[in-house]
């Protein structure tokens, strides 16, 4: 189950965008071997809102593009398919039978700014940020160079499957 909640009014959100986001999340999770019913919440917000969240949770007082709030724990260097592939989840990890993977807060205002800056479509940027955040929910990180290379490779492979190129 993918929940999308539009809490901003600066960028028009239509059914096509929502459906593409849901489709790309579902595809990414299948590619990452999430073979259990799941729940992810995506909240579309503006730069002011994401700045507040970034300050509250990361102590960084500036707007960012996307924030991820994973619900599962991961050992350093491990991702979902390394730890949870055939795992028996506890009832506390489930909500109405769905594994709660976490929440995504995405600034559509920042996505639009970055799409212009990088010279590609708003759809491509929004899908990229969504994939990036989903991978964080699955334990991927980019703090170390080797982790960054792996994460970028996964992002590009998924985008390529949707014909979304830079």
Curated annotation (Swiss-Prot):
Binds 1 zinc ion. GO terms for molecular function: metalloendopeptidase activity; RNA endonuclease activity; zinc ion binding. It is found in: Cytoplasm. InterPro entries: MetalPrtase_cat_dom_sf_prd, YbeY, YbeY_CS. This is Endoribonuclease YbeY. It comes from the Bacteria. It comes from Clostridium botulinum (strain Langeland / NCTC 10281 / Type F). One of its GO terms (cellular component) is cytoplasm. Disulfide bonds: none annotated. Pfam families: YbeY (PF02130). The keyword Hydrolase applies. Zn(2+) binds at residues 132, 136, 142. GO terms for biological process: rRNA processing. Its main location: cytoplasm.
